[in-house]
């Protein structure tokens, strides 16, 4: 049996707890479009390598209800899911939505899948969908880049069921005993933090939602991707006193304004994930986050406020990081009802997540070994109409990055009534670009 510590990190266990408590969790979807035939030999090599990197695993639960779960080896699907019939270019987004909606499960599998859709006009679309519990955005960048360049990792995780139930009970019970001092310390810190932030917690007001109650149904959250030439993006950012990253935040603020995703004072709250992944770091989610307030009315002419706000937030994180992570050792003890309440508090706060993965390695745009003509990445999640009404609408975290001479920004949004259309979201994205004096394509 492996001597590697296969215990999942508290952050990953929290993500898994959220999935089981809420019945849904985010997935990350990467998409490549080829305007010529895809090299299936190269793509199958890429698929093989993905299962031998950070994606090649799933979770095996502890037999203890309050135990720590573990990673086990799982290579993923045996082959690429190739659509039997070609579809038109105009159906690409519908196909991507269908792929994002297919079951992905970090415990029962598959925790990821790779699919290909031939196009009537020529070429094909390739998409990779992965559980956010198994890998975060930066982790997926690493997994894809390594797979595309032929690099594999020996994670040395055991196979499913390699421990007998008796063995698992004994090992996990000992682990719980070892964790008790840390849990006690965490409880004290959490109580102190809750007392300090009590005013913020009790002052949360739910957003107004539709009074019409309809039967619940699955909602396809409209999604679009903005593509802008890198030189245009960088020149505009510099002219506004910002950076490529701060322009992404300004763009997020402007989208929030145009979609009505603002606070009572008209400001926009943006949550920015902060990567904490170290070399050879096998955590699924190796990140924290900072929050900043942006004025959507000034970002189109001056990005210095957003830039300095992010810098201040990152500086403050050095002092607040331990406080933010203090409660994580209590994760195995959190009841599902508490997870559902936390979700309600978070989603009703009208925060916009904005993730900028930076410049991708060119290899990340070569799943079959050659450059794709177009690339995008986004967050997606199974959402019901009941969920939308309960939380007052959904604004998926924006995902932005740079590759193949372009900046891309993915946007996913739907109002509480589920009536937002992709055409409306496209119009908003075009208007937000125009607010900054930029042009691009929205697809």
What are the residue ranges of the model-derived segments?
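Short amphipathic beta-strand and strand-loop transition segments with alternating hydrophobic
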Residues: 114-116, 397-400
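N-terminal alpha-helical "arm" segments
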Residues: 2-23
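Long, Pro/Ser/Thr-rich low-complexity/intrinsically disordered regulatory tracts in eukaryotic proteins
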Residues: 21, 27, 266-267
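Soluble acyl-CoA-dependent acyltransferase catalytic core bearing the H(X)4D motif
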Residues: 6, 32-41, 45-52, 59-392, ...
């Amino acid at each position: 049996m492996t001597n590697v510590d296969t215990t999942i990190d508290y952050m990953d266990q929290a993500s898994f707890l959220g999935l089981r408590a809420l019945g849904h969790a985010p997935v990350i979807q990467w998409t490549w479009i080829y305007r010529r035939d895809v090299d299936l030999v190269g793509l199958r090599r890429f698929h093989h390598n993905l299962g031998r990197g950070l994606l090649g695993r799933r979770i095996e639960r502890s037999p203890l209800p309050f135990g720590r779960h573990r990673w086990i080896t799982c290579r993923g699907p045996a082959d690429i899911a190739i659509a039997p019939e070609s579809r038109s270019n105009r159906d690409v987004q519908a196909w991507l939505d269908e792929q994002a909606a297919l079951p992905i499960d970090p415990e029962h599998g598959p925790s990821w899948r790779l699919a290909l859709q031939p196009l009537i006009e020529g070429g094909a679309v390739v998409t990779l969908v992965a559980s956010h519990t198994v890998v975060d955005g930066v982790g997926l960048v690493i997994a894809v880049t390594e797979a595309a360049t032929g690099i594999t990792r020996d994670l040395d995780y055991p196979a499913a069921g390699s421990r007998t139930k008796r063995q698992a009970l004994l090992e996990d019970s000992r682990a719980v005993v070892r964790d008790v001092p840390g849990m006690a310390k965490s409880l004290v810190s959490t109580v102190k933090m809750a007392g300090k932030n009590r005013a913020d917690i009790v002052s949360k007001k739910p957003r107004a939602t539709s009074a019409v109650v309809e039967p619940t149904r699955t909602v396809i959250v409209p999604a679009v991707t903005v593509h802008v030439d890198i030189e245009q993006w960088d020149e505009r950012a510099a002219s506004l006193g910002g950076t490529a990253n701060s322009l992404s935040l300004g763009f997020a603020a402007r989208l929030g304004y145009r979609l009505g995703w603002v606070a009572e004072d008209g400001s926009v709250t943006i949550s920015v994930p902060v990567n904490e992944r170290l070399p050879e770091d096998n955590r699924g989610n190796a990140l924290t986050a900072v929050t900043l307030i942006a004025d959507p009315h000034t970002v189109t002419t001056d990005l210095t406020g957003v830039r300095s706000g992010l810098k201040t937030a990152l500086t403050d994180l050095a002092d607040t990081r331990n406080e933010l992570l203090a409660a994580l050792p209590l994760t195995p003890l959190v009841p599902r009802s508490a997870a559902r309440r936390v979700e309600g508090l978070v989603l009703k706060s009208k925060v916009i997540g904005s993730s900028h993965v930076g410049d991708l390695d060119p290899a990340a745009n070569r799943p079959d070994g050659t450059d794709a003509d177009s690339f995008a990445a986004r967050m997606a999640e199974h959402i019901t109409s009941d969920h939308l009404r309960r939380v007052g609408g959904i604004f998926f975290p924006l995902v932005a990055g740079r590759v193949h001479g372009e900046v891309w920004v993915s946007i996913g949004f739907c109002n509480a009534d589920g009536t937002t259309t992709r055409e409306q979201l496209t119009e908003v994205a075009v208007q937000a670009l125009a607010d900054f004096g930029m042009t691009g394509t929205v697809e």
